[in-house]
Protein backbone atom coordinates (compact mmCIF):
# COMPACT_ATOMS: atom_id res chain seq x y z
CA UNK A 1 0.00 0.00 0.00
CA UNK A 2 1.34 3.43 -0.94
CA UNK A 3 2.16 6.03 1.70
CA UNK A 4 -0.62 8.29 0.38
CA UNK A 5 -3.21 5.54 0.92
CA UNK A 6 -1.92 4.79 4.42
CA UNK A 7 -2.05 8.45 5.49
CA UNK A 8 -5.51 8.89 3.97
CA UNK A 9 -6.77 5.78 5.79
CA UNK A 10 -5.33 7.08 9.06
CA UNK A 11 -7.13 10.37 8.51
CA UNK A 12 -10.48 8.62 7.95
CA UNK A 13 -9.97 6.40 11.02
CA UNK A 14 -8.95 9.40 13.11
CA UNK A 15 -12.01 11.39 12.01
CA UNK A 16 -14.27 8.45 12.89
CA UNK A 17 -12.66 8.15 16.35
CA UNK A 18 -13.08 11.87 17.03
CA UNK A 19 -16.76 11.73 16.06
CA UNK A 20 -17.23 8.60 18.19
CA UNK A 21 -15.55 10.13 21.23
CA UNK A 22 -17.62 13.31 20.88
CA UNK A 23 -20.98 11.71 20.04
CA UNK A 24 -22.47 12.67 23.42
CA UNK A 25 -21.43 16.29 22.83
CA UNK A 26 -23.24 16.37 19.49
CA UNK A 27 -26.40 14.94 21.11
CA UNK A 28 -26.29 17.46 23.97
CA UNK A 29 -25.60 20.26 21.50
CA UNK A 30 -28.70 19.26 19.52
CA UNK A 31 -30.85 19.57 22.66
CA UNK A 32 -29.27 22.95 23.46
CA UNK A 33 -30.43 24.33 20.12
CA UNK A 34 -33.97 24.63 21.54
CA UNK A 35 -32.90 27.46 23.87
CA UNK A 36 -30.25 29.07 21.67
CA UNK A 37 -30.56 32.33 19.78
CA UNK A 38 -29.83 31.06 16.29
CA UNK A 39 -28.62 34.36 14.84
CA UNK A 40 -25.70 34.23 17.27
CA UNK A 41 -24.86 30.72 16.05
CA UNK A 42 -24.82 31.99 12.48
CA UNK A 43 -22.46 34.75 13.64
CA UNK A 44 -20.22 32.11 15.27
CA UNK A 45 -19.98 30.21 11.97
CA UNK A 46 -19.08 33.35 10.02
CA UNK A 47 -16.52 34.55 12.57
CA UNK A 48 -14.97 31.08 12.87
CA UNK A 49 -14.47 30.86 9.11
CA UNK A 50 -12.96 34.34 9.24
CA UNK A 51 -10.43 33.08 11.81
CA UNK A 52 -9.15 30.55 9.24
CA UNK A 53 -8.81 33.42 6.78
CA UNK A 54 -6.71 35.27 9.39
CA UNK A 55 -4.47 32.20 9.58
CA UNK A 56 -4.05 32.42 5.82
CA UNK A 57 -3.06 36.09 6.15
CA UNK A 58 -0.51 35.10 8.80
CA UNK A 59 0.97 32.46 6.50
CA UNK A 60 1.18 34.93 3.62
CA UNK A 61 2.95 37.53 5.78
CA UNK A 62 5.64 35.16 7.06
CA UNK A 63 6.13 33.54 3.65
CA UNK A 64 6.64 36.99 2.16
CA UNK A 65 9.40 37.48 4.72
CA UNK A 66 10.96 34.38 3.13
CA UNK A 67 10.33 35.92 -0.35
CA UNK A 68 7.59 33.42 -1.32
CA UNK A 69 4.20 34.34 -2.76
CA UNK A 70 1.43 31.76 -2.30
CA UNK A 71 -2.26 32.35 -3.09
CA UNK A 72 -4.59 33.09 -0.16
CA UNK A 73 -7.04 30.34 -1.11
CA UNK A 74 -4.32 27.71 -0.94
CA UNK A 75 -3.16 29.10 2.40
CA UNK A 76 -6.77 29.01 3.65
CA UNK A 77 -6.92 25.34 2.65
CA UNK A 78 -3.59 24.79 4.39
CA UNK A 79 -4.95 26.37 7.59
CA UNK A 80 -8.02 24.12 7.60
CA UNK A 81 -6.18 20.91 6.68
CA UNK A 82 -3.34 21.43 9.18
CA UNK A 83 -5.95 22.13 11.89
CA UNK A 84 -7.65 18.86 10.91
CA UNK A 85 -4.34 17.00 11.25
CA UNK A 86 -3.66 18.56 14.67
CA UNK A 87 -7.10 17.52 15.87
CA UNK A 88 -6.95 13.96 14.52
CA UNK A 89 -3.30 13.20 15.34
CA UNK A 90 -2.29 14.36 18.87
CA UNK A 91 1.33 15.39 18.25
CA UNK A 92 1.41 18.75 20.08
CA UNK A 93 1.05 20.54 16.74
CA UNK A 94 3.98 18.86 14.99
CA UNK A 95 1.70 16.88 12.66
CA UNK A 96 0.08 20.10 11.47
CA UNK A 97 3.49 21.68 10.86
CA UNK A 98 4.65 18.73 8.75
CA UNK A 99 1.39 18.74 6.81
CA UNK A 100 1.55 22.47 6.10
CA UNK A 101 4.97 21.93 4.54
CA UNK A 102 3.24 19.35 2.33
CA UNK A 103 0.63 21.93 1.27
CA UNK A 104 3.26 24.56 0.44
CA UNK A 105 5.57 22.40 -1.65
CA UNK A 106 7.12 22.62 -4.21
CA UNK A 107 7.24 26.45 -4.15
CA UNK A 108 8.32 26.52 -0.50
CA UNK A 109 11.04 24.11 0.68
CA UNK A 110 9.76 21.59 3.24
CA UNK A 111 12.02 22.89 6.00
CA UNK A 112 10.77 26.46 5.66
CA UNK A 113 7.16 25.32 5.33
CA UNK A 114 7.58 23.46 8.63
CA UNK A 115 9.15 26.55 10.22
CA UNK A 116 6.22 28.68 9.03
CA UNK A 117 3.82 26.69 11.20
CA UNK A 118 6.24 26.47 14.13
CA UNK A 119 6.53 30.26 14.15
CA UNK A 120 2.75 30.49 14.22
CA UNK A 121 2.78 28.49 17.47
CA UNK A 122 5.58 30.66 18.87
CA UNK A 123 3.94 33.98 18.00
CA UNK A 124 0.54 32.79 19.23
CA UNK A 125 2.09 31.73 22.56
CA UNK A 126 3.66 35.17 22.96
CA UNK A 127 0.32 36.79 22.14
CA UNK A 128 -1.52 34.60 24.66
CA UNK A 129 1.02 35.55 27.34
CA UNK A 130 0.45 39.22 26.48
CA UNK A 131 -3.29 38.85 27.13
CA UNK A 132 -2.85 37.35 30.62
CA UNK A 133 -2.44 40.72 32.42
CA UNK A 134 -5.33 42.11 30.34
CA UNK A 135 -7.65 39.33 31.53
CA UNK A 136 -6.50 39.77 35.14
CA UNK A 137 -7.19 43.52 35.03
CA UNK A 138 -10.65 42.95 33.53
CA UNK A 139 -11.50 40.41 36.22
CA UNK A 140 -10.03 42.50 39.03
CA UNK A 141 -12.30 45.38 38.02
CA UNK A 142 -15.32 43.27 39.03
CA UNK A 143 -16.07 40.66 41.69
CA UNK A 144 -14.51 37.82 39.69
CA UNK A 145 -10.99 38.11 41.09
CA UNK A 146 -9.66 34.81 42.39
CA UNK A 147 -6.07 34.72 43.60
CA UNK A 148 -5.82 30.94 43.18
CA UNK A 149 -6.95 31.09 39.55
CA UNK A 150 -4.58 33.96 38.79
CA UNK A 151 -1.64 32.21 40.42
CA UNK A 152 -2.39 29.00 38.52
CA UNK A 153 -2.53 30.82 35.19
CA UNK A 154 0.68 32.72 35.86
CA UNK A 155 2.51 29.52 36.89
CA UNK A 156 1.26 27.72 33.76
CA UNK A 157 2.30 30.65 31.57
CA UNK A 158 5.72 30.66 33.26
CA UNK A 159 6.09 26.93 32.52
CA UNK A 160 5.25 27.48 28.86
CA UNK A 161 7.71 30.37 28.69
CA UNK A 162 10.40 28.21 30.31
CA UNK A 163 9.74 25.32 27.93
CA UNK A 164 9.81 27.78 25.03
CA UNK A 165 13.20 29.14 26.08
CA UNK A 166 14.60 25.62 26.48
CA UNK A 167 13.33 24.62 23.02
CA UNK A 168 14.78 27.81 21.52
CA UNK A 169 18.17 27.09 23.08
CA UNK A 170 18.07 23.50 21.82
CA UNK A 171 17.10 24.56 18.29
CA UNK A 172 19.98 27.02 18.23
CA UNK A 173 22.28 24.04 18.83
CA UNK A 174 22.30 23.19 15.13
CA UNK A 175 24.70 20.28 15.43
CA UNK A 176 22.53 18.53 18.04
CA UNK A 177 19.32 19.07 16.06
CA UNK A 178 20.88 17.74 12.86
CA UNK A 179 22.00 14.59 14.67
CA UNK A 180 18.50 14.09 16.07
CA UNK A 181 16.99 14.78 12.65
CA UNK A 182 19.24 12.20 10.99
CA UNK A 183 18.52 9.61 13.69
CA UNK A 184 14.74 10.06 13.42
CA UNK A 185 14.74 9.85 9.63
CA UNK A 186 16.76 6.62 9.74
CA UNK A 187 14.78 5.10 12.61
CA UNK A 188 11.31 5.93 11.27
CA UNK A 189 10.93 5.39 7.55
CA UNK A 190 7.58 7.21 7.37
CA UNK A 191 9.51 10.42 8.13
CA UNK A 192 11.41 10.03 4.88
CA UNK A 193 9.71 13.11 3.38
CA UNK A 194 11.32 15.33 6.03
CA UNK A 195 14.41 13.24 6.50
CA UNK A 196 16.63 14.65 3.78
CA UNK A 197 19.58 16.90 4.51
CA UNK A 198 17.91 19.67 2.52
CA UNK A 199 15.02 19.75 5.02
CA UNK A 200 17.37 20.70 7.86
CA UNK A 201 19.28 23.10 5.61
CA UNK A 202 16.08 24.88 4.59
CA UNK A 203 14.81 24.97 8.17
CA UNK A 204 17.98 26.62 9.45
CA UNK A 205 18.15 28.96 6.49
CA UNK A 206 14.73 30.30 7.48
CA UNK A 207 15.55 30.17 11.20
CA UNK A 208 18.66 32.34 10.82
CA UNK A 209 16.81 34.69 8.48
CA UNK A 210 14.05 35.25 11.06
CA UNK A 211 16.27 35.74 14.09
CA UNK A 212 18.75 37.76 12.06
CA UNK A 213 16.01 40.32 11.40
CA UNK A 214 13.28 39.94 14.04
CA UNK A 215 11.43 42.99 12.70
CA UNK A 216 10.13 40.88 9.80
CA UNK A 217 7.98 39.04 12.36
CA UNK A 218 6.02 42.15 13.35
CA UNK A 219 3.27 41.71 10.74
CA UNK A 220 2.89 37.94 11.41
CA UNK A 221 2.68 38.76 15.12
CA UNK A 222 -0.08 41.31 14.50
CA UNK A 223 -2.06 38.65 12.61
CA UNK A 224 -1.51 36.23 15.52
CA UNK A 225 -2.87 38.79 18.01
CA UNK A 226 -5.83 39.54 15.72
CA UNK A 227 -6.57 35.82 15.46
CA UNK A 228 -6.75 35.48 19.25
CA UNK A 229 -9.06 38.50 19.53
CA UNK A 230 -11.39 36.95 16.94
CA UNK A 231 -11.32 33.56 18.71
CA UNK A 232 -12.20 35.16 22.05
CA UNK A 233 -15.00 37.08 20.33
CA UNK A 234 -16.28 33.78 18.91
CA UNK A 235 -16.37 32.32 22.41
CA UNK A 236 -18.16 35.42 23.67
CA UNK A 237 -20.82 34.87 20.99
CA UNK A 238 -21.44 31.44 22.56
CA UNK A 239 -22.30 33.22 25.83
CA UNK A 240 -24.63 35.60 24.00
CA UNK A 241 -26.28 32.67 22.20
CA UNK A 242 -27.38 31.41 25.62
CA UNK A 243 -28.64 34.86 26.60
CA UNK A 244 -25.93 35.88 29.05
CA UNK A 245 -23.70 38.96 28.98
CA UNK A 246 -20.52 38.46 31.03
CA UNK A 247 -17.31 40.26 31.83
CA UNK A 248 -15.01 39.85 28.79
CA UNK A 249 -12.25 38.97 31.25
CA UNK A 250 -14.04 35.69 32.04
CA UNK A 251 -14.08 34.74 28.37
CA UNK A 252 -10.47 35.82 27.83
CA UNK A 253 -9.25 33.94 30.92
CA UNK A 254 -11.20 30.86 29.85
CA UNK A 255 -9.60 30.96 26.42
CA UNK A 256 -6.11 31.41 27.87
CA UNK A 257 -6.40 28.58 30.41
CA UNK A 258 -7.96 26.20 27.87
CA UNK A 259 -5.17 26.86 25.38
CA UNK A 260 -2.44 26.44 27.99
CA UNK A 261 -4.01 23.10 28.98
CA UNK A 262 -4.25 21.97 25.37
CA UNK A 263 -0.54 22.71 24.88
CA UNK A 264 0.35 20.17 27.58
CA UNK A 265 -2.46 17.74 26.70
CA UNK A 266 -2.04 17.97 22.93
CA UNK A 267 0.90 15.58 22.88
CA UNK A 268 -1.28 12.85 24.39
CA UNK A 269 -4.86 13.36 23.28
CA UNK A 270 -6.51 16.02 21.11
CA UNK A 271 -9.99 15.44 22.55
CA UNK A 272 -10.93 16.61 26.05
CA UNK A 273 -8.05 18.73 27.39
CA UNK A 274 -9.44 21.99 26.01
CA UNK A 275 -13.06 21.17 26.92
CA UNK A 276 -12.39 20.09 30.52
CA UNK A 277 -10.13 23.05 31.28
CA UNK A 278 -12.51 25.60 29.70
CA UNK A 279 -15.49 24.27 31.66
CA UNK A 280 -13.43 24.14 34.86
CA UNK A 281 -12.11 27.70 34.65
CA UNK A 282 -15.55 29.10 33.83
CA UNK A 283 -16.95 27.39 36.94
CA UNK A 284 -14.01 28.68 39.01
CA UNK A 285 -14.86 32.20 37.81
CA UNK A 286 -18.41 31.94 39.06
CA UNK A 287 -20.39 30.51 36.15
CA UNK A 288 -22.90 27.71 36.92
CA UNK A 289 -21.60 24.30 35.84
CA UNK A 290 -24.51 23.61 33.46
CA UNK A 291 -24.03 26.98 31.79
CA UNK A 292 -20.23 26.61 31.57
CA UNK A 293 -20.63 23.17 29.99
CA UNK A 294 -23.20 24.54 27.52
CA UNK A 295 -20.86 27.34 26.42
CA UNK A 296 -18.02 24.85 25.98
CA UNK A 297 -20.22 22.52 23.93
CA UNK A 298 -21.48 25.30 21.66
CA UNK A 299 -17.97 26.63 21.06
CA UNK A 300 -16.26 23.28 20.49
CA UNK A 301 -19.01 21.45 18.61
CA UNK A 302 -19.46 24.32 16.17
CA UNK A 303 -15.69 24.47 15.84
CA UNK A 304 -15.62 20.79 14.88
CA UNK A 305 -18.60 21.06 12.52
CA UNK A 306 -17.04 24.05 10.75
CA UNK A 307 -13.45 22.81 10.71
CA UNK A 308 -13.33 19.02 10.44
CA UNK A 309 -15.39 18.22 7.28
CA UNK A 310 -13.72 20.81 5.00
CA UNK A 311 -10.42 20.13 6.77
CA UNK A 312 -10.71 16.47 5.80
CA UNK A 313 -11.52 17.41 2.18
CA UNK A 314 -8.40 19.59 1.95
CA UNK A 315 -6.36 16.97 3.82
CA UNK A 316 -7.36 14.43 1.19
CA UNK A 317 -6.57 16.90 -1.60
CA UNK A 318 -3.00 17.53 -0.44
CA UNK A 319 -2.31 13.93 0.52
CA UNK A 320 -2.37 13.30 -3.23
CA UNK A 321 0.82 15.35 -3.44
CA UNK A 322 2.62 12.91 -1.14
CA UNK A 323 5.64 11.44 -2.78
What are these regions, as identified by a protein language model?
Residues 82-90, 255-275:
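Transmembrane alpha-helix interface/packing and boundary motifs in multi-pass membrane proteins
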Residues 1-80, 147-263, 302-323:
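Predominantly cytoplasmic-facing regulatory/coupling regions of multi-pass membrane proteins
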Residues 73-77, 91, 95-96, 106-122, ...:
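Membrane-interface alpha-helices at helix entry/exit sites of multi-pass transporters
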Residues 141-145, 240-246, 286-291:
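Helix-coil boundary and interhelical linker segments in multi-pass alpha-helical membrane proteins
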Residues 80-98, 207:
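Short intracellular "coupling" helices and adjacent cytoplasmic loop segments at the cytosolic face
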Residues 81, 85, 89, 114-137, ...:
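Membrane-embedded alpha-helical segments of transport systems
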Residues 64-65, 87, 106, 137-140, ...:
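Transmembrane helix-loop junction
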Residues 92-106, 266-284:
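Re-entrant/interfacial helical elements at transmembrane boundaries that shape
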